Amino acid sequence: MTRLHVLHVDDEPDIREVAALSLELDADMSLTSAASGGEALDLLQRDLRPDVILLDVMMPELDGPGTLAQLRELPGHERTPVIFMTARAQSSEVNRYIALGAIGVIVKPFDPMSLAASVRGALADAGR
């Protein structure tokens, strides 16, 4: 299996830490974390090329959907897979996130032991 590089964007330090511990336990994944949409966009503009982005929906200043819209304008990131992470998992919300271009949604709180499998599953479902 190919090693996946994940960019995880979340304003909550505890969520970033749990995700980092979970994903770094998986020998087939490497991780870069960002505390805001703006920080993530800066990293991407400096040639970070993740295989997938885990993107929190609700963040101050620049939320997940706003970050995704700006991400799609960056050369080389028009099709980077994005998985939204949210506590709002009503079907109308999930459908909205998919319509915005996400390949999947992970509901918070998430099971740290299955986070890597959830990422792989969303990528497989999207044919990536």
What are these regions (language model features)?
Residues 3-14, 19-23, 53:
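Conserved acidic segment of CheY-like receiver
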Residues 33-52:
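Acidic, metal-coordinating helix/loop segments flanking the phosphotransfer/catalytic sites
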Residues 110-119:
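C-terminal output helix
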Residues 59:
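Receiver (REC) domain active-site loop signature in two-component systems and cognate sites
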Residues 103:
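Short, glycine/charged-rich "phosphate-handling" switch motifs in NTP-dependent
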